[in-house]
């Protein structure tokens, strides 16, 4: 085996507008609170049960943070891909505390808006870099906000026209 994998994928809704701040270095950081929900039927009572889990997401990628600031609002449905990290901090009494966060680093991670902002009902995908070619804008308009490389027009050989007829 080649090592280990630390990858978190979430599809959920923002519980609040993104919190945008700047580090001492001047880098922009976005903090998101994302809710994921699951529902099931209780076998004994037949009653429908729901459970919501809240996730803290930190975006260190400046381009993705700008996208979050500009386009994301409370209630927006998003796809997030990042890594799980534990952050150690101290409370007011000096006690050590730990928080689990999904982190999108400068050149890793992905943010995809799943809500429609156009008539076509398609979402937009913004990548944080890496060595994958990926479609940065499914709707055909707008820019490649999260691209870190010089991939201006090509999408790894795939056509951007998603309405092509399937030959079978």
From Swiss-Prot:
InterPro entries: NA-bd_OB-fold, Primosome_PriB/ssb, ssDNA-bd. The keyword DNA-binding applies. A motif (Important for interaction with partner proteins) lies at residues 163-168. Residues 5-111 form the SSB domain. Residues 54-60 bind DNA. Residues 147-159 have a biased composition (Low complexity). One of its GO terms (molecular function) is single-stranded DNA binding. One of its GO terms (cellular component) is nucleoid. Keywords: DNA damage, DNA recombination, DNA repair, DNA replication, DNA-binding. GO terms for biological process: DNA recombination; DNA repair; DNA replication. The keyword DNA repair applies. It comes from the Bacteria. Coiled coil: none annotated. Residues 113-168 are annotated as: Disordered. Plays an important role in DNA replication, recombination and repair. Binds to ssDNA and to an array of partner proteins to recruit them to their sites of action during DNA metabolism. Homotetramer. This is Single-stranded DNA-binding protein.
């Amino acid at each position: 085996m080649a090592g280990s994998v630390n990858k978190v994928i979430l599809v959920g809704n923002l519980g609040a507008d993104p919190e945008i701040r700047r580090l001492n270095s001047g880098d922009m950081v976005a903090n998101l609170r994302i809710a994921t929900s699951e529902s099931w039927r209780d076998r004994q009572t037949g009653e429908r049960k729901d459970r919501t889990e809240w996730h803290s997401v930190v975006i260190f990628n400046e381009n993705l943070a700008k996208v979050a600031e500009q386009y994301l609002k409370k209630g927006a449905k998003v796809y997030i891909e990042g890594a799980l990290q534990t952050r150690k901090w101290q409370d007011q009494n000096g006690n050590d505390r730990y928080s689990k966060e999904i982190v999108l680093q400068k050149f890793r991670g992905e943010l995809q808006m799943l809500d429609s902002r156009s008539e076509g009902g398609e979402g937009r995908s913004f990548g944080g870099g890496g060595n994958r070619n990926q479609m940065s804008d499914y709707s055909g308009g707008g820019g490649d906000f999260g691209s870190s490389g010089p991939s201006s027009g090509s999408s790894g050989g795939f056509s951007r026209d998603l309405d092509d007829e399937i030959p079978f």
